[in-house]
């Protein structure tokens, strides 16, 4: 019989127990996020724009101090992000955006946003910043200007739809084709909307 160093015997996992494992939804948005991070690295390395992902704030609960110079965090939790996912600068203009993903085939749920995020976006727009959402939905990627998101958000708050229908999103947003380098070239749309001659 095989035993661990602590004396307990080895118990192999059975096929039945591995089949009962519940699916994990913890990294649903990682593909979109990874593609955006690669895109932003491309923009920065080619001196196009400087856009960074904001770190998720962490609430530290318990710290051990075995030595004065060696503090060890024993317990910490991710806090709710207070603003948007990404910010930076492009052609002298402040850029601020959120990245969202849904598996729904019919609509984009507005519950993906929080009041404080919408309020932050409104403040950015009021200061003439470029603010938008990159949405991965219906096997497509969309660029939705913050001002258009505000319409859907206000409709929801007036006891209206709690989501953006597929046809509404396709009409209000700008599609972004996936590329190789950069992967999600959202700067093209920013150029069309904010920097092309009228």
Curated annotation (Swiss-Prot):
- Where in the cell does this protein reside? Cytoplasm
Where Mg(2+) is bound, by residue?
83, 85, 98, 117
- GO cellular component terms? cytoplasm
Q: According to the UniProt entry, which residue ranges have a biased composition of type Polar residues?
A: 8-29
A GO MF annotation of the entry reads: nucleic acid binding
Per its UniProt record, the required cofactor names are: Mg(2+)
Main localization of the protein? cytoplasm
Q: State the family named in the UniProt similarity comment for this chain.
A: Belongs to the RecU family.
Please describe what this protein does: Endonuclease that resolves Holliday junction intermediates in genetic recombination. Cleaves mobile four-strand junctions by introducing symmetrical nicks in paired strands. Promotes annealing of linear ssDNA with homologous dsDNA. Required for DNA repair, homologous recombination and chromosome segregation.
Its recorded name reads Holliday junction resolvase RecU
Q: What is the lineage of its organism?
A: Bacteria, Bacillati, Bacillota, Bacilli, Bacillales
